[in-house]
Amino acid sequence: MTLNIVAQSNPTRITDTGDGFNVTDDNSTRSFNPNHRDSVADKEIPMGVHTWTVDRRYGDVTPAVTDTLPHLYQNSIFNTGVFGEYNTIGNNYTPRISRIIMDRPKTSEFFFTQPYDFTMKEPDAFQFVNTLSPFTNLSYDNCGDKQNGEDHIDAKFAVNANKRLGIGFDLDYHYARGYYQNQSTSHFGASLFASYIGDKYQMHALFSTYHRKAAENGGITDDNYITHPESYDDQFSENEIPTVLSKNWNRNNSNHLFLSHRYNIGFYKRVALTEAEKKARAFAKASAQDRKQRDNLRNNQDGDDANGNKRRNNRRTTDPVATGRPDGARIAGDLPKTGEKPADPDSTRIQVTSQQMADSLLAVQHQKDSLDANTKRIYVPVTSFIHTLDINSFSRINQAYASPAGYYANTYYKYDDRGIYGNDSIYDQTKYLSVKNTFAVALMEGFNKYAKAGLKAFFSYDHRKYQMPDLLQEGDEGYYMRSWSEGLVSVGGQLSKTQGRTFHYNLDGEFFLTGSNAGSVSLNFNTDVNFPLFGDTVRLAAKAHFDRITPTFFQRQYHSKHLWWDNGDMSKEIRSGIEGIFTIDKTHTQLRVAVEEIKNYTYFGMEYAIDEKHNFTGLQGGVYQEGGNINLLTAQLRQNFKLGPLHWENIVTYQHSSNKDVLPVPTVNIFTNLFFKFLVVKQLTVELGADATFFTKYYAPDYLPQISQFAVQKNVESRVELGGYPFVDVYANMHLKRTRFFVMMSHVNKGMGNKMMFLAPHYPQNGKVLRIGVSWNFYN
């Protein structure tokens, strides 16, 4: 695909006022050319960009903050998260898992790609765009060289055909060669989106395709290469440290189609225009006048004919002179007879009989013009009929050309379905298709003063198809691809209040009636109250949830060459919890406290042995359930300080798990960011500082590369405790008009302290790396 980006044709004409709009530079020397179609560039370009997300079930629109904000831009490139809260396996764009349990999502039906969520854009997180002028964002960040470096480029484009219909695309490419052996990653994603926001009909459509390839190295063979390099006679660079696996890959391809549309029944009313809409109207009016002026000038100019000869324009140079009635002219019709009254005037025309009446008509017209100039007519929906189509297709291959001797504890077949990939080679395939239709009816909130809440009801049917290896009979040397299909029916509803400034709430539920999920229930409630306190607004929010869910299909059964389980008797996992969030904007304080109880906790586990020669042997992995109750307590404080140009941001999280053997958590997790923020020549905003991430020691989840999942360390004899080591970055983050850019040195403290630079057992993080990044916004 070819992407042509055209920036402003005369950049000196446009000046950023700093308030989100551009104005013309009066000192420009560009001459006016009436035949030049780009002359509208002399006028202010409207830059209003509105972004929002949509609910995956109902298609409800929620305004969103644009993802082009400059603060912490330098941290947005890491799969460890903006606040460093994720564990990863070293290289960027590799699988990850949050250390903050309450922020972990539910296990997805095709969990193999869930750890790559950093490189994906789910429909309910994707930002749709409505823009007054074509909008383009180009972002690029880079580090390292051709042997070990990283490259990331993202191109976003959005344009509106009119004020209702918007379209665009998002192209995203992540490529990391890896500082350690056999750990390269390559991810490409492309998304096409469209939205139509009409009065009665609304539509959101998103098509995405992803192609992911990741080399798996199984970790380094000996942690002492990192923690005690002096124990070796030779010094090893990062790319010389031996790894457990080589020539092993995971490939994940997926295609997604999301369509949500609705038909509204309601009435019209008038509301005031926003400032951006006023700017857009002024721009359109000025453009129309400009076109008219250019057309008039063109018609009045002398030009050359086809032979190059001068021709006279067609405009008359003198006014015509009246010469009286032509000879022989007649008056049409009969003259009125003597004594006959003239015909009555047209009674349908407005007759102005006095100056007072003329003034009144002018006042009415002026009032109408003022109303049209400052207000708009909007449609107020009363009832909506909603349909949502959600199609997801996944295909995964775990491939290996070689496996270490004794690395796997079990082998369930020798060859793939084509009779190849025998011996120590692997070719495991897994596929999943879901076609889900949801139909809903909504009674909208706020269509009159008595409609204090909105009410929705829905019906969903989800057709699912799974494919993976199976054996015709035990002892077969080759597998065949077996298919499983099921249909799931669920019903539910929502009661919500989102309008107003003081009190909001939302209650939604889903109940499964058929399929393997029959009997599953999901209930969620959240509310918030805003009230004044000491001259500031205080927000108090609360959340509660109850889930009784069946483990996913691949948690219940999974077949591959070396990992195999059939857990058809697994119980439903039951989770219940409450959370409170207390926020004071004036003091930059936010406190979150959450309590959750889990029964039949379902988790991944793995175990292996390491001999004296650092060989990994007897690898086993699977899905397990803890029948007892697990209690989880979480408290998180966000506190920011400011003293002149000095800013200090902090996030401190405390967690306690009643069963750390199956649900391990760090007791304390800290993110801190200290920086100076100042202006250079009144245009360039600079953030100059350092941030750090730290967590206390705990038995962090290991990584099972055969299924791309983090798993509990079940081998008590060889499990590894991680933590107690800070990761420190220093950076200069800058913002100039519509451009963001940064220079960063990540992990500047490499080799200091206990040198435990691991976020997963045997997977060291990258060392000290110089990184740069830039992001441009174009409005033209």
Residue ranges and their predicted role:
Residues L3-A7:
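Sec/Tat signal peptide C-region and signal peptidase I cleavage site
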Residues Q8-F258, R262-A343, S347-T348, N530-T537, ...:
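Membrane-proximal, glycine/serine-rich, low-complexity loop/turn segments characteristic
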Residues F207, I241-G303, R312, K341-S347, ...:
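Exposed, low-structure sequence patches enriched in small/polar residues
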